[in-house]
Design a protein with these regions (language model features):
Chain A
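Hydrophobic single transmembrane helices highlighted by the model
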Residues: 42-62
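N-terminal secretory/membrane targeting signals
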Residues: 1-25
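Detector for the c-type heme attachment site
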Residues: 226-230, 293-299, 325, 350-354
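Extracytoplasmic/periplasmic beta-strand context in beta-sandwich domains
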Residues: 190, 236-239, 305, 331, ...
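Non-transmembrane, membrane-proximal soluble domains of secreted or membrane proteins
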Residues: 25-48, 69-279
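Flexible coil segments in periplasmic/lumen-exposed cytochrome c-class electron-transfer proteins
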Residues: 256-277, 282, 286-287, 335-374
Length: 374, 534
């Protein structure tokens, strides 16, 4: 499998453009299958230009090959010194612009059509999702429901073959509905892109961009951040689960119920034991923090600080709470105050202070976070 | 004043010796040589960075460099190849050849010529420091932005970005001065009888290149200065929270960045305009249309910059305008390809190394042209944008379009510069080696891009492994071939068969060809009395 793919890749490289015209679709030599009307239109446009490009290249290569075979000195061919003064030589310069303009207008005509579809925001959307890029994860807010999903990359151990293309919490969307995405960012530029269902628009801090789609087929669709956004640019994948509208409604109801229960739990006055917090914290740490600080807490030397025996994780509790809540300006450390609730934050901090030999024995309570937030 | 001394001495080939010959040089040939040597050094530094990038991408996972160092290498590879390699090499050729071609004794502004060159090593040191400063603790995040240095990311970066901004300032001053010098020389220093429409195409290409640089370089300098102010002096030109606009920087950058592409391409097109007639032994086909359409390309190139930003969310009307403008670029480019092919038509072709490069350029640059039209189509570009498809496209445009054109120029003029013929057999081996390995490197990248691999990622999913391995193997071969290039150059400089004044049989066909009437190597001062142009 892999070997044949490799051979194909070599062949593709050597045969230059001729292959590009014929070997579409299989073996990832082309775009993945589009599953929305707009991406289908873009795919068709891509195929049209690819075909025109292939034809042009065949013609150019053909003429050049003919010239090189026919008009060589070694065959005794003598140069025609007056060729450029002939009628052809005098007037041919009008030929190319006319032909090329014709091709250009053909392409531009069909492109303008698709472009108007892309920019058509007149129809009402059934689902509106605000997509927020931040270093280095995606947050999805369903504007009509009180649902918020934070989507982090899955570590290699869990993602397997989909590593760098798999996340813990995918965006769930219904099929057959008009979906509107609002793109923005919290820190630097990002670009949200899932080629099969929706094209790119940049996420720009302080601005909102809009795209839309209508997914025709259930499935899991993957993509990656397309605009360079710093250290973790390669590590912020995108996954969309497209499900039937019924399943989507059920998922939404469950999501709302769980969120309500979690909120209630976090705001209760219960005092938690260290072990309870540690157990909750481990899972939360692995999904939210291990992208940078690593599962074993060692970080990445020179890029992300380790937490094993670190001053923050073993020193003053308030300082630890402060950096997790508010982030650290000028570094990649994000502010988590708005992303996790008090109980979750308390659990993560407790975990960090007791895992990997950081045996401080501290149990940070949700109440501590509540007071620190003030 | 020097001229007076020379005349009394009757010794036109007297040249200063020692370091002063180079440091204080006002001689267009010596400055040209220094530009070319500088470009060669930078080619190896930028190439070494490319080798590190491809070595990292050979396998998925993080093997050789960390993500920040990787992105810094990507940034500096681009800047060094553009500002350190292609532009100085083209400027070196302009310095060497333009005065000889138009019958001028030297450049119009020889002292400024000296300064434009000597700013370059300073700029290169700043640029390399911006890469190395990350190894000193406390200097902040490395330059992990890519060469486009888009804010807000470039505001997060540490000290490296300041060094880079100062380097860009110096590079800009250097290019503007060099361009003013070249344009002035072309307008004022032509020998009697050398009308504009008799100038070799290379001179015309540099005329437009110089004008482009004079127009766009100040915009880049302004843009990066605003960035510097945002970073340190509390302004918010590019910060939405302070009423600024991050996209404004992209417009400023690409107003420079797109014409910059033609700055890189045009001199090489000029070289083709000499090489192809020479080895086809017949005059350039359609000289006048080529000049006019070069002017058209120059004008059009200035007003299509935003096709690099289709995804930033511009209005339908603006996007449509930039799409159609961009697609129209295929007209001048198409005409150039057409005219070069028909220069060969009914010619008497031989296949020396410069000609082999020229033919390869026609084919591969056409290919870059058709993928360029694909990319210009906005709806499709919303899928291609920022993937390896784009990386493949612009390497096809810039390596054949600019770099191979310079190689063709080096092989074409080395006999003139040194007085020795290069080893034709080694030249041909170098041609086949680079051309094949270049295609092996970049052709697969079209497919990894279509399959969804974004640019500038240090690690990739295993589905892209085959394409990346082929690409890396090709890149190593491509890199290695340049050692042969270096060997050929050193060998030719040191000795070899006498070249004679006109080493190429067809060199003077269809052009005044003044440069070929001088001996090889030409004397230190080419002309003491204006040459005659028929």
């Amino acid at each position: 499998m892999s070997k044949s793919k490799m051979i194909l890749a070599v062949l593709a490289s050597l045969l230059l453009t001729t292959l590009a015209g014929t070997a579409y679709a299989d073996y990832a030599l082309n775009f993945p299958e589009p599953v929305a009307p707009l991406t289908q239109q873009m795919y068709d446009l891509h195929m049209l230009t690819t075909k025109i490009a292939t034809i042009i290249m065949v013609i150019v290569i053909g003429i050049v090959a003919f010239v090189l075979i026919k008009f060589r000195k070694s065959k005794g061919y003598e140069a025609d010194q007056n060729f450029h003064k002939s009628t052809f030589g005098t007037w041919s310069w009008t030929l190319v612009p006319i032909i090329v303009l014709g091709i250009d207008l053909t392409i531009a005509g069909s492109a303008t059509d698709a472009l108007q579809q892309v920019e058509d925001y007149s129809q009402k959307a059934d689902v509106t999702v605000k997509v927020i890029g931040s270093q280095w994860k995606w947050t999805y807010e369903y504007m009509d429901d009180d649902i918020r999903i934070v989507s982090n990359m899955l570590p290699k151990e869990e993602a397997g073959d989909n590593y760098l293309r798999a996340v813990d919490n995918p965006l769930v969307l219904p099929t057959g509905k008009r979906i509107r995405f609002l793109h923005t960012a919290s820190d630097v530029l990002h670009a949200w892109w899932v080629p099969q269902i929706v094209y790119k628009k940049d996420s720009i801090p302080g601005y909102i961009n809009e795209t839309w789609t209508n997914i025709q087929k259930e499935g899991t669709y993957r993509g990656q951040c397309a605009e360079i956004c710093g250290t973790g640019h390669a590590f912020m994948p995108i996954v969309v689960e497209a499900v039937s509208p019924e399943k989507y409604e059920a998922w939404k109801a469950e999501k709302l119920m769980v969120a309500e229960a979690a909120a209630a739990e976090a705001s209760s006055d219960k005092t938690w034991t260290k072990d309870e917090l540690y157990a909750r914290g481990e899972g939360l740490y692995n999904t939210n923090c291990s992208g940078c600080h690593q599962v074993n807490g060692t970080g990445m030397p020179g890029v992300f600080p380790g937490l094993v025996g670190s001053k923050i994780a073993t020193g003053d509790i308030d300082a630890h709470i402060n950096i997790v809540l508010n982030g650290k300006a000028g570094t990649a450390m994000a502010a988590w105050a708005a992303q996790l609730n008090d109980l979750e934050l308390a659990a993560v901090i407790t975990y960090e202070r007791n895992a990997w030999g950081n045996n401080t024995g501290d149990a940070v309570q949700p109440a501590d976070l509540k007071s620190a937030r003030k | 004043m020097n001229a007076v001394i020379h005349e009394t001495d009757h010794h036109h080939d007297h040249k200063p010796t020692g370091y002063k010959r180079w440091l204080y040089s006002t001689n267009h040939k010596d400055i040209g040589t220094m530009y070319l040597v500088f470009a060669l050094v930078m080619l190896f530094i930028g190439g070494a960075m490319a080798m590190l990038i491809r070595a990292e991408l050979y396998m998925p996972g993080l093997q050789i460099v960390n993500p920040d160092l990787y992105n810094n290498l990507v940034t500096d590879h681009a800047l060094i190849m553009i500002f350190g390699m292609v532009m100085p090499a083209a400027a070196g050729m302009a310095n060497w050849m333009i005065p000889m071609m138009i019958g001028a004794p030297d450049m119009a502004l020889p002292r400024m010529n000296n300064m434009s060159f000597w700013l370059l090593p300073a700029a290169a040191i700043l640029l390399l420091s911006s890469l190395l400063v990350q190894f000193i603790p406390g200097t902040g995040v490395p330059v992990n932005t890519g060469w486009t240095i888009y804010p807000p990311l470039s505001v997060q970066v540490g000290m490296g970005m300041d060094l880079l901004i100062f380097s860009v300032h110096l590079l800009g001053i250097s290019s503007i001065m060099a361009s003013i010098n070249i344009v002035t020389t072309i307008l004022n220093m032509r020998a009697p009888g050398m009308t504009m429409m008799k100038m070799p195409l290379f001179v015309w290409s540099w005329f437009f290149t110089g004008l482009l640089l004079i127009i766009v370089m100040p915009v880049l300098a302004g843009g990066v200065t605003m960035l510097l102010f945002d970073r340190h002096f509390g302004t918010s030109f590019f910060d939405a929270a302070g009423g600024g606009d991050p996209i404004l920087f992209q417009h400023l950058f690409w107003f420079f960045g797109h014409p910059e592409v033609y700055v890189l391409l045009l001199p090489s097109i000029g070289v083709l305009g000499l090489v192809i007639p020479t080895f086809s032994r017949k005059p350039l086909f359609g000289y006048k249309p080529l000049v006019y359409f070069m002017g058209f390309l120059f004008a059009l190139g200035l007003v299509v910059w935003a096709h690099h930003q289709y995804t930033v969310g511009m209005s339908l009307a603006v996007t449509t305008y930039f799409m159609i403008g961009t697609i129209l670029i295929s007209i001048p480019i198409g005409l150039m390809i057409f005219n070069f092919i028909f220069t060969m038509w009914r010619g008497s072709i031989t296949f020396e190394t410069p000609m082999l490069f020229a033919i390869a350029i026609i084919l591969m640059f056409s290919f870059a042209g058709v993928t360029g039209v694909m990319l210009a189509v906005v709806p499709a570009d919303l899928q291609y944008h920022d993937t390896y498809f784009v990386v493949a496209h612009f390497h096809y445009a810039l390596i054949p379009g600019a770099v191979f054109g310079l190689y063709a120029g080096v092989f074409y003029w080395l006999p003139k510069w040194t007085g020795h013929m290069y080893d034709e057999k080694l030249g041909k081996i170098f041609f086949w080696w680079t051309t094949l390995s270049f295609n092996l490197t970049f052709f697969p990248q079209h497919f990894s891009g279509l399959a969804g691999m974004p640019r500038r990622i240090v690690d990739y999913n295993i589905q892209y492994i085959e394409f990346n391995q082929v690409s890396s193997i090709g890149a190593f071969a491509f890199g290695l071939s340049h050692l042969l290039f270096l060997y050929i150059i050193i060998q030719t400089v040191r000795g070899g068969k006498e070249a004679g004044a006109k080493p190429w049989e067809g060199a003077q066909i269809g052009t005044p060809g003044l440069e070929w009437s001088l001996p090889s190597p030409p004397p230190f001062h080419s002309y003491t009395t204006p040459p005659e142009v028929k």
